[in-house]
């Protein structure tokens, strides 16, 4: 159990002392700082530290709690050669000029829907069909009703229940449980996730129309298998990437980031919205584009 008597490393103190403003990377900053705090403080203490550091900032409801819970599965391990301050520099800044040019050129949600080889508006594919075709019928899948209720089970053991889950890890797992940073067994950890099968691109700002244009543009660079509405304010674009290393995927992720993508989905065990499922408030995870033909 992390102890609040342990002094924070200087780089963590530096991070906490200089949060960006809303619109300047605050959402990503919360995730990054929470990630390095996990081995040093309890969940409640991390929330308190982030609340204190961002006092007066226009935070979204639940934003800090979500950052803390979402970052735990890829928490920093003390002893790793990591300098979050310098590591952050490798991520490109959002290029608003380039982003606007793409938005003006590439179309909107109507165009994204029209690009789908499988027309999903009248007869949408079921969650079971999508997962069978994209993830495979003989694999281990990690899913959950909430961020904190992850389970990893054989595909057939999930049969008929996946649409009741809010979240899924977009790559198969290799075993039922792995070890977290503090050595505890967990169904969702870097210790039991397999090679990336999909890299999911999510944007935390911009309208649905703008996000659609960005996904259309990115689909010219990589195979877009699925576009799913989060039931809130974003679209999750599933890009097929089986067989590619993180080094090979990094330029694409950086390009997506420069156009407004969140960094959090780079973490291979980050939960994303279940295709065809429902948000906890009942809002559907509508499938806008479904292209199983790109999956080999």
Identify the function of each model-found stretch:
Residues 139-140, 225-226, 236, 271:
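Beta-sheet entry/capping signal
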Residues 264-278:
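Acidic carboxylate-rich catalytic motifs and surrounding loops in phosphoryl-/glycosyl-chemistry enzymes
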Residues 225-232, 263-267:
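Short beta-strand
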Residues 118-121, 219-229:
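Short, glycine- and small/hydrophobic-rich beta-strand elements in well-ordered beta-sheets
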Residues 182-187, 213, 219-223:
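Alpha-helical scaffolding within the catalytic cores
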Residues 23-26, 185-193, 225-230:
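Short, flexible, solvent-exposed loop/turn segments with mixed acidic/basic and small polar residues
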Residues 1-107, 149, 196-220, 230-261, ...:
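Modules that initiate DNA replication and primer synthesis
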Residues 2-3, 76-198, 270, 285, ...:
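DNA replication initiation on ssDNA origins
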């Amino acid at each position: 159990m992390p102890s609040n008597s342990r002094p924070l490393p200087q780089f963590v103190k530096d991070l906490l002392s200089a949060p960006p403003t809303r619109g300047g990377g605050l959402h990503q900053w919360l995730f990054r700082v929470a990630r390095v705090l996990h081995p040093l403080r309890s969940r409640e203490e991390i929330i308190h530290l982030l609340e204190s550091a961002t006092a007066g900032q226009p935070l979204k409801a639940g934003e800090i709690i979500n950052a803390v819970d979402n970052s735990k599965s890829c928490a920093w391990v003390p002893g790793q050669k990591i300098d979050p301050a310098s590591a952050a520099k490798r991520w490109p800044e959002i290029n608003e000029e380039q982003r606007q040019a793409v938005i003006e050129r590439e179309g909107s949600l109507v165009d994204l829907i029209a690009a789908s080889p499988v027309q999903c508006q009248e007869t949408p594919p079921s969650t079971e069909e999508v997962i069978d075709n994209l993830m495979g019928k003989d694999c281990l899948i990690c899913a959950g009703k909430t961020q904190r209720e992850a389970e990893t089970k054989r595909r057939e053991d999930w049969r008929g229940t996946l649409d009741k889950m809010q979240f899924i890890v977009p790559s198969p797992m290799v075993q039922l449980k792995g070890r977290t940073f503090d050595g505890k067994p967990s169904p969702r950890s870097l210790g039991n996730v397999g090679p990336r099968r999909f890299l999911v691109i999510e944007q935390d700002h911009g309208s649905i129309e703008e996000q659609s244009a960005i996904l259309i543009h990115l689909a010219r660079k990589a195979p877009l298998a699925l576009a799913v509405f989060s039931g809130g304010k974003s679209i999750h674009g599933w890009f097929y990437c089986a067989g590619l290393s993180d080094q090979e995927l990094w330029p694409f992720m950086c390009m997506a980031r420069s156009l407004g993508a969140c960094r959090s989905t780079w973490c291979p065990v980050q939960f994303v919205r279940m295709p065809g499922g429902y948000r906890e408030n009942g809002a559907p995870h509508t499938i806008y584009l479904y292209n199983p033909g790109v999956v080999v």
